C-alpha cells in the first residue's frame, strides 16, 4: 500500500515527465521552512525553468493546474498555492494527515522499512585489538556501527556485522610479554622490572589490573572460550606461544562479555592472522607487483599510491621483510568484495584518517573490479567522561582509560547507546554520567522512553489488556486540533528520516527525530485529554497515541535502545 506522500510523488513525477522527458526523477517534496506556508513544498518548477528556458513562475502555474487535476491530489490535497518565483506550497486535507495513523497501526514494527533490495552490506566496527578491555571510544563505535546496521536493514539491505581482530601485530607481543612478566611474579614499579633490549621499559607494557587477571588464570591452567573456539593454558611461564594464544583468547572472551552487556551480536569475527595463514596477504602483494604498481627503493617495496590520489607513495614491505599495517588491510578489503559485499562501511576513530587514501589506492591498484570510493568510512572522535562534575580519565581495571563496562555499570546500556549516538560521530562528545542517570526531561533517553511509557499507561487506562489492532479502523476525523496535526505530520516523516539517515550514515538523526516526536507527544497530551467520555473522540485519540508509541518503539529499536512500557 502506497503512503499518501508516495501517491502524491507518483502523480508529481508523471506530470513532470509530461513537462520534460526525464524530469520525473526530480519529483521531490520538502518541508516548508515556515509551517504556515503549508505541509509540503515543491521547487521543481524553478529547477526546470533554466534548462527549459521558461519563466519559473509560469512553469509553476502550469504544474499547479496539472497537479490539481490528478486523482491523487484531488483525494489528499486541500490546496496548492504558488509563491515567489515558482514555489508550490501544498496543504493536505485532514484525512491525508490522519492516514499515517492507519499506516503505522497496520505495519507495526515494519513501519519505515523498505522492500528487500537484494544487496549485501558489510558493516565493520569495534575491531579492537585483543590487548585490553573495550574503552569508551570502542563503545561509541559499537553504538554507531550497530545503529548504522539497523538503518541499512530498514532500507532493504542484507546486513552483515563484522569484527576484525588485529591479532598479528606488535601490540600482541607487548600483551604477551606483559602477561609473562606478571606470571613470573614481576609487577610495574619493581626494581627487577626488565629494561633490556628484549623487554623494553616498563612504560611500554600494559599495566592494568586485567593483566594480572590473565596471568593468574594462565597459572591456574584455565580454559577460556573465545568466539567459536576454546583454549587451555598450560601454566608454563616459559612457553611464550602458549601465553600469547591464551592471553588473546582471554581478552577476546572479556570483550565478548562487554559486547553482550551492550546487547551487541556480530555475525562474524575475522582474524587478521587468517589473512597471513591463508596466503591472502602474499597474494595481494604479488598481484600489485605483477600489475606494475610497486617499486623497490632503499631495500623496501613501495606502492605507487600517488597514482591513485594519495599524497605520497607508501611502503608495503619494510627492509626487514615484514609488511606495513595497511597491506593486510588491502588484502582484507579484497576479501570483503570477493565475498559479495557490494557496499562496505568501516566505523573507525579519526586517528585512522590517514589510512583511507592508501587502502583505497591499494584496492584500485589491485584491479579486481572494486569501484572507486570503496569502502565507505565513518570516522568518530573519542569521548570525554565527566562524573560528579570532574573528568574521569583512569579506570583501575584498565589502568589508563575508562572502559565501556565502567560506563554501562555507572548508567545503563540504554543510556550509553543513546548518549553516544546523540551527536554526529566526528563531533567531540562529553558523556555526563550524572545526566545519564537523571530522571528528568534534561536526560534525552529518559525523555523519549518516558513518552513511550506514558502512552502505554494511557492505553492501560483504556483497557488493561489493550490490543491496538482494535484501533486500526476507527474513525479518525476527530483528529483536527493543531497538536494532533503536528504529531501526525511528524509520524509521516519517519520513513524518509530513516532513508536520509541511512544514506548519510547518520544515526544521530534518529535521536533528533525521537526527541522531536516525544516533545510533540507531550505537547499533544497536555493539550487534549485522551480518555474522554465521547467514544468516537476517545477511539481516534487512542489510535493516534498508539501509533506514536509504535514509532517511538521502532526508532528506539534502530538505536538498540529499549522502549519500556512502565517507568
UniProtKB/Swiss-Prot annotation:
InterPro entries associated with the record: aa-tRNA-synth_I_CS, Arg-tRNA-ligase, Arg-tRNA-synth_N, Arg-tRNA-synth_N_sf, ArgRS_core, DALR_anticod-bd, Rossmann-like_a/b/a_fold, tRNAsynth_Ia_anticodon-bd
Subcellular location: Cytoplasm
GO molecular function annotations of the record: arginine-tRNA ligase activity; ATP binding
Protein name in UniProt: Arginine--tRNA ligase
Motif ('HIGH' region): 128-138
Catalyzed reactions per annotation: tRNA(Arg) + L-arginine + ATP = L-arginyl-tRNA(Arg) + AMP + diphosphate
Annotated keywords: Aminoacyl-tRNA synthetase, ATP-binding, Cytoplasm, Ligase, Nucleotide-binding, Protein biosynthesis
Entry-linked Pfam families: Arg_tRNA_synt_N, DALR_1, tRNA-synt_1d
Family (UniProt): Belongs to the class-I aminoacyl-tRNA synthetase family.
SUPFAM superfamilies, sorted: Anticodon-binding domain of a subclass of class I aminoacyl-tRNA synthetases, Arginyl-tRNA synthetase (ArgRS), N-terminal 'additional' domain, Nucleotidylyl transferase
Assembly behavior: Monomer.
GO biological process: arginyl-tRNA aminoacylation
Record's keyword annotation contains Secreted: no
EC number(s) from the headed UniProt entry: 6.1.1.19
GO CC annotations, alphabetized: cytoplasm
CDD domains: Anticodon_Ia_Arg, ArgRS_core
Amino acid at each position: 500500500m502506497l503512503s499518501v506522500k508516495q501517491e502524491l510523488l507518483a502523480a508529481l513525477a508523471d506530470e513532470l515527465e509530461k513537462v520534460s522527458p526525464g524530469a520525473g526523477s526530480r519529483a521531490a517534496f520538502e518541508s516548508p521552512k515556515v509551517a504556515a506556508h503549508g505541509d509540503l513544498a515543491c521547487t521543481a518548477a524553478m529547477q526546470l525553468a533554466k534548462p527549459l528556458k521558461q519563466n519559473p513562475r509560469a512553469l509553476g502555474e502550469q504544474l499547479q493546474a496539472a497537479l490539481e487535476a490528478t486523482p491523487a491530489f484531488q483525494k489528499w490535497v486541500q490546496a496548492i498555492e504558488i509563491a515567489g518565483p515558482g514555489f508550490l506550497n501544498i496543504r493536505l486535507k485532514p484525512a491525508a494527515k490522519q492516514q499515517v495513523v492507519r499506516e503505522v497501526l497496520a505495519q507495526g514494527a515494519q513501519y519505515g522499512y523498505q522492500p528487500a533490495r537484494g544487496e549485501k552490506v558489510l558493516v565493520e566496527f569495534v575491531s579492537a585489538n585483543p590487548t585490553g578491555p573495550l574503552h569508551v571510544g570502542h563503545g561509541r563505535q559499537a553504538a554507531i556501527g550497530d545503529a548504522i546496521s539497523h538503518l541499512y536493514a530498514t532500507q532493504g539491505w542484507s546486513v552483515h556485522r563484522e569484527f576484525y581482530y588485529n591479532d598479528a601485530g606488535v601490540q600482541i607481543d607487548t600483551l604477551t610479554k606483559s602477561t609473562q612478566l606478571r606470571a613470573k611474579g614481576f609487577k610495574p614499579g619493581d626494581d627487577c622490572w626488565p629494561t633490556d633490549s628484549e623487554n623494553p621499559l616498563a612504560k611500554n607494557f600494559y599495566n592494568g589490573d586485567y593483566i594480572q587477571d590473565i596471568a593468574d588464570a594462565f597459572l591456574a591452567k584455565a580454559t577460556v572460550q573465545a568466539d567459536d573456539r576454546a583454549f587451555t593454558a598450560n601454566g608454563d611461564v616459559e612457553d611464550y606461544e602458549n601465553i600469547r594464544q591464551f592471553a588473546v583468547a582471554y581478552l577476546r572472551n572479556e570483550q565478548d562479555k562487554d559486547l553482550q552487556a551492550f546487547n551487541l551480536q556480530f555475525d562474524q569475527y575475522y582474524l587478521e592472522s587468517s589473512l597471513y595463514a591463508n596466503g591472502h596477504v602474499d597474494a595481494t602483494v604479488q598481484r600489485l607487483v605483477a600489475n606494475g604498481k610497486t617499486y623497490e627503493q632503499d631495500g623496501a617495496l613501495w606502492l605507487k599510491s600517488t597514482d591513485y590520489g594519495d599524497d605520497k607513495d607508501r611502503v608495503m614491505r619494510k627492509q626487514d621483510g615484514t609488511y606495513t599495517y595497511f597491506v593486510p588491510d588491502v588484502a582484507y578489503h579484497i576479501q570483503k568484495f570477493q565475498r559479495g559485499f557490494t557496499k562496505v562501511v568501516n566505523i573507525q576513530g579519526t586517528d585512522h584518517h590517514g589510512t583511507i587514501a592508501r587502502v583505497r589506492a591499494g584496492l584500485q591498484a589491485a584491479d579486481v573490479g572494486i569501484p572507486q570510493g570503496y569502502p565507505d568510512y565513518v570516522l568518530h572522535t573519542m569521548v570525554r567522561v565527566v562524573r560528579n562534575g570532574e573528568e574521569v580519565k583512569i579506570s583501575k581495571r584498565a589502568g589508563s582509560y575508562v572502559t565501556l563496562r565502567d560506563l554501562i555499570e555507572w548508567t545503563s546500556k540504554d543510556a550509553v547507546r543513546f548518549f553516544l549516538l546523540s551527536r554526529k560521530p566526528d563531533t567531540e562528545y562529553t558523556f555526563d554520567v550524572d545526566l545519564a542517570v537523571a530522571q528528568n526531561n534534561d536526560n534525552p533517553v529518559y525523555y523519549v522512553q518516558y513518552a513511550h511509557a506514558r502512552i502505554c499507561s494511557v492505553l492501560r487506562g483504556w483497557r488493561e489488556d489493550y490490543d491496538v489492532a482494535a484501533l486500526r479502523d476507527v474513525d479518525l476525523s476527530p483528529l483536527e486540533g493543531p497538536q494532533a496535526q503536528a504529531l501526525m505530520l511528524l509520524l509521516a516523516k519517519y520513513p524518509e528520516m530513516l532513508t536520509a539517515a541511512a544514506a548519510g550514515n547518520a544515526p544521530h538523526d534518529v535521536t533528533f527525530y525521537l526527541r522531536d516526536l516525544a516533545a510533540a507527544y507531550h505537547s499533544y497530551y497536555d493539550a487534549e485529554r485522551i480518555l474522554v467520555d465521547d467514544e468516537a473522540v476517545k477511539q481516534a485519540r487512542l489510535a493516534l497515541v498508539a501509533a506514536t508509541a509504535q514509532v517511538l518503539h521502532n526508532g528506539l529499536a534502530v538505536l538498540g535502545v529499549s522502549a519500556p512500557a512502565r517507568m
